[in-house]
Amino acid sequence: MAETSPHARCLACAFPFWEQLTPEEQERLCRFTRPVHYAKGARVHSPLESCVGILLLRSGQLRSYLLSEDGRDVTLYRLFGGEVCILSASCVMDAVNIDLYIDAEEDTEALCISAGIFRQLMQENVYVRCYAYQLTAERFSDTMWT
């Protein structure tokens, strides 16, 4: 069923949990995925905005950073084509509470998965939940050691 979606192949390649999803879950994930474009310099996510969703970068570059009270920023990590931006939907993870900013450093094309649907899948499917928390832990680990 999900194979008829234009995004199914891309999602299947990007997410190691794809084969652990039921056909209905695959179809739901595809149905609530949409292409997005961010121009160079655009704000993708901030603590003041609603939850963007999970971003699968097709091309371009995003920078994730924190802002200090005096306005200085600290880059946490950068994401490139083929990578998944999980913290653009940190609202789906109860254990993650961070005032994160994400900007497009280059024109960026991505697929955006609805935060609400991803949250539902995390609640229903342990493979999705493990993937989300593992990817978050890897991002923070990379930040600590670079």
Task: Annotate each language-model stretch with its function.
Residues R78-S141:
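Cyclic-nucleotide recognition modules
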Residues M1-A39, A89-V92:
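Cyclic nucleotide-binding regulatory module and flanking cytosolic helices
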Residues R43-E105:
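Cyclic nucleotide-binding regulatory domains
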Residues R9-L21, F32-P35, L57-D70, A115-R119:
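Short low-complexity stretches enriched in small and charged residues
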Residues L21, G71, E124-V128:
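Alpha-helical structural elements of signaling/regulatory helical domains
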Residues T143-T146:
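Short, Lys/Arg-enriched, Trp-marked, Pro/Gly-tolerant hinge/linker segments that flank
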Residues A39, L66, A132-Q134:
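Compositionally biased, intrinsically disordered low-complexity regions enriched in proline and serine
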